[in-house]
């Protein structure tokens, strides 16, 4: 499924999120299951499936990492984290060092300032990777994008863990 086509958006890494939301709500108004309660069971199933597809597509396009993975998929590529990471041991070492730093901060009840500094460091790394990914998409440098997305995934995991703490 091409979610860019579903939401009538250009197939680009950077999207107009306002337009995405606007088109999402238009589709929801058209395919919301509650609007079909008096229709046949088969029609209800079709509409429910379409609604699920719309919600899934919206979530994918809202998130920069998932949007990048979807764009790669549409261009015939699939990410294999294991293959990419096995080729870049230096990144894995840096990542594990950051994860150890995060564990230390969380286990030692460090103050909010230290955690905030670490969070900003991770946010900056994510922002930098996203900017580079945008450039690489424009250049159609698929192999570079795959490597960058795999690294971005790790920083997003650290960010998620920080937000949950």
Curated annotation (Swiss-Prot):
The keyword Chaperone applies. Keywords: Chaperone. Pfam families: HSCB_C (PF07743). SUPFAM superfamilies: Chaperone J-domain, HSC20 (HSCB), C-terminal oligomerisation domain. It comes from the Bacteria. GO terms for molecular function: ATPase activator activity; protein-folding chaperone binding. GO terms for biological process: [2Fe-2S] cluster assembly; protein complex oligomerization; protein folding. InterPro entries: DnaJ_domain, HscB, HscB_C_sf, HscB_oligo_C, J_dom_sf. Residues 2-74 form the J domain. Interacts with HscA and stimulates its ATPase activity. Interacts with IscU. PANTHER family: IRON-SULFUR CLUSTER CO-CHAPERONE PROTEIN HSCB. Co-chaperone involved in the maturation of iron-sulfur cluster-containing proteins. Seems to help targeting proteins to be folded toward HscA. Belongs to the HscB family. This is Co-chaperone protein HscB.
């Amino acid at each position: 499924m091409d979610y860019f086509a579903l939401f009538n958006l250009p197939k680009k890494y950077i999207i107009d999120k306002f337009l995405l939301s606007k088109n999402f709500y238009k589709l929801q108004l058209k395919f919301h299951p509650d609007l079909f309660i008096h229709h046949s069971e088969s029609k209800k199933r079709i509409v429910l499936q379409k609604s699920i597809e719309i919600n899934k597509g919206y979530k994918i396009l809202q998130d920069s990492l998932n949007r990048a993975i979807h764009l790669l998929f549409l261009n015939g590529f699939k990410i294999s984290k294991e293959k990419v990471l096995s080729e870049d041991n230096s990144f894995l070492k840096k990542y594990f060092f950051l994860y150890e730093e995060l564990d230390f901060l969380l286990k030692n009840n460090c103050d909010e300032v230290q955690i905030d500094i670490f969070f900003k460091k991770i946010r900056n790394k994510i922002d930098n990777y996203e900017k580079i990914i945008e450039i690489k998409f424009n250049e159609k440098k698929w192999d570079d994008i795959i490597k960058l997305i795999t690294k971005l995934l790790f920083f997003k995991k650290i960010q998620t863990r920080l937000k949950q703490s």
